[in-house]
Regions:
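Hydrophobic anchor residue at the start of the ABC signature
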Residues: 143
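Conserved ABC ATPase signature
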Residues: 129-133
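Conserved catalytic motifs of ABC-family nucleotide-binding domains
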Residues: 150
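Conserved ABC transporter NBD signature motif
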Residues: 61-69, 76-77
Length: 196
């Protein structure tokens, strides 16, 4: 059985004045896929994701997410995408369980912190504060928060930047596990080996 398209981008353009940050990119992502946007810093990868996430306006082109038109259905699109926050997006002094409860309230989605942390192998850190985590643990926790609203798609922007080789492998095992549970994963990276 062929997977269906969950994201379709056609000739996407984003201009900032005379600077063209995204230059007519087109691609398709299929349900259950891990899809990577590869390119150097400044190539427009993050901007492309931010447009699809409805965080930025596009200058041209078409975007469809799960059949919804970005120009007409932004609220519906927002509900099916989980977005990874960078470490600076978390209150460092709160316990992981408190942060999950905070995000759970924002999404109006009841979640058991222990169950969610178990998915990312952090169940023993429930009472730890965010600032007490290692770099790899912080990345895994940020991925856990993308799963709170049970999204069809998650976006991970440069998820392994700054991680040591073992933490990178652990993160990739987690991403593959998330995909195996039916969630489509979109990543940006400037590492060729990750894109492969």
């Amino acid at each position: 059985m062929e997977n269906r398209k969950i994201i379709e981008v056609r000739n996407l353009v984003k201009n900032y004045g005379s600077f063209e940050a995204v230059k007519g990119i087109s691609f398709e992502v299929y349900e259950g896929e891990i899809f990577g946007l590869l390119g150097p810093n400044g190539a427009g990868k993050s901007t492309t994701l931010e447009i699809i996430e409805t965080l930025r306006e596009k200058s041209g082109g078409e975007v469809y997410v799960n059949g919804y038109d970005l120009d007409k259905d932004k609220d519906k699109i927002k509900r099916i995408i989980g977005v990874q926050l960078q470490a600076s997006g978390f209150y460092p002094g709160l316990k992981l369980s408190e942060l999950i409860e905070l995000f759970s309230g924002l999404y109006n989605e009841p979640v058991d912190p222990h169950t969610l942390l178990k998915l990312v192998k952090l169940e023993d850190k429930t009472k730890n504060k965010f600032k007490e985590l290692s770099g790899g643990q912080k990345q895994r926790f940020s991925i856990a928060t993308t799963l709170i609203n049970k999204p069809k798609i998650i976006f991970l922007d440069e998820p392994t930047t700054g991680l040591d080789p073992q933490a990178r492998r652990n993160l990739w095992d987690l991403v593959k596990d998330i995909r195996c549970k039916g969630t489509t994963v979109i990543i940006t990276t400037h590492y060729m080996d990750e894109a492969e």
